[in-house]
Amino acid sequence: MVMFKKIKSFEVVFNDPEKVYGSGEKVAGRVIVEVCEVTRVKAVRILACGVAKVLWMQGSQQCKQTLDYLRYEDTLLLEEQPTAGENEMVIMRPGNKYEYKFGFELPQGPLGTSFKGKYGCVDYWVKAFLDRPSQPTQEAKKNFEVMDLVDVNTPDLMAPVSAKKEKKVSCMFIPDGRVSVSARIDRKGFCEGDDISIHADFENTCSRIVVPKAAIVARHTYLANGQTKVFTQKLSSVRGNHIISGTCASWRGKSLRVQKIRPSILGCNILKVEYSLLIYVSVPGSKKVILDLPLVIGSRSGLSSRTSSMASRTSSEMSWIDLNIPDTPEAPPCYMDIIPEDHRLESPTTPLLDDVDDSQDSPIFMYAPEFQFMPPPTYTEVDPCVLNNNNNNNNVQ
């Protein structure tokens, strides 16, 4: 019977554990080995990988696809490697710490940003292998983060984005006016911590009370075997005051902050992470009027964008101090562990934007308070007329 020798510790350690790497940068670290007893080691190897993969079930069919970004293999040596003669094995003894250094460069060009979603991920890791004669190979694995640069200061992403939409409202096939919304944001590209300054105009000519709102929404698109899977998350939102029938409302620099989220992933062929600013009007008893303004979340923010963001935030706070009633901000994605389950939807966008309190603060029609009648008298099974007749008879007798 072969007795397996235990290893006290076997781990991969990076020189800068907190660093987020970019294309062309060097990843360096060491593999640390400690033993409990004298051990002969044939080799210490590493394998570095970066891969995007998607996987989900479409009925009985498995949709699966992978895309490699990185693959690097090497056999490591000690700086002063003690050997056991001809076979060149390393003799490791208890009480000593053996360190094998490694280093490699990430490929130049676009790399997928590290990401973990419901149906796919982009992972980068280093795996170490400890080969011993007559013993099973021992493995140790360590992940590291990679972020592909997305510069939001390009002319395309600094250009304003605008849209407008109008919807006819009806009740029992009878026309009931219109609801219209037009909106504009100063630019398309933002970074974590930036404030989106929203300029919008709303008009309500229907008989219902409507509520204007805005939300940042993430869309994760997975592609495999010719099939597409879309997963939507509502990240943060803000709302305005009710708009009664026959009136208008405007937002002039209403602010919505970009929470802690991953940059957009647009260059991957099997996995995309896209963001949108949805400006919409909740119309009770009818579909929402929704404007979809595309956003690009970047990894680099310039001074000009940050300055304009702060300026818009200040003006918005001064102008809307009495009117801005924001929703409680929700946790941003890492995605799968911190997004509430009720905001993880694979259905269309409209159910995603439904709010629990719509039925309470958005009556369908404007109406006068209902008249309350007096309650009926207390019911009794004893006829008071019979009691009165009996009392009168007793008095006569």
Swiss-Prot record:
UniProt tissue specificity: Ubiquitously expressed.
The keyword Cell cycle appears for this protein: yes
Subcellular location(s) per record: Cytoplasm
Pfam family, one: Arrestin_C
SUPFAM superfamilies with a match to the protein in the record: E set domains
UniProt-listed SMART domains: Arrestin_C
UniProt cross-link Glycyl lysine isopeptide (Lys-Gly) (interchain with G-Cter in ubiquitin), position: K213
InterPro entries: Arrestin-like_C, Arrestin-like_N, Arrestin_C-like, Arrestin_domain-protein, Ig_E-set
Recorded GO CC terms: cytoplasm; cytosol
Name this polypeptide is given: Thioredoxin-interacting protein
Organism this protein belongs to: Mus musculus (Mouse)
